[in-house]
């Protein structure tokens, strides 16, 4: 089991919406890409261990 990461979607008002928890950064990136493909927007991956954002992705809508 790898390190824990949380995937969040940034809402239009700037607040984060928790999407899911994932084991391992590479798996978190794969899951983020899948989620963003079906629901475009701004997402980020948060490292639970390091208490910081480690990856962000913007998927334009439209």
Language model region names:
Residues 1, 29-37:
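Short linear motifs in intrinsically disordered
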Residues 1-17:
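Short aromatic-glycine-(Arg/Gly/Cys) micro-motifs in beta-strand/loop hairpins
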Residues 10-12, 25, 48:
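Generic structural motif
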Residues 14-26:
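A short, exposed loop/beta-hairpin motif centered on an aromatic-Gly-Thr core
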Residues 15-18, 31, 49, 55:
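Generic short amphipathic/hydrophobic targeting helices enriched at N-termini
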Residues 26-31, 62:
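Short, surface-exposed linear segments at secondary-structure transitions and domain or protein termini
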């Amino acid at each position: 089991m790898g390190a824990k990461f949380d995937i969040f979607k940034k809402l239009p008002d700037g607040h984060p919406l928790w999407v899911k928890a994932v084991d391992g950064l590479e798996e978190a990136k794969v899951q983020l890409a899948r989620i963003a493909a079906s629901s475009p927007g701004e997402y980020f991956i948060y490292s639970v261990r390091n208490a910081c954002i480690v990856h962000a992705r913007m998927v334009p809508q439209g």
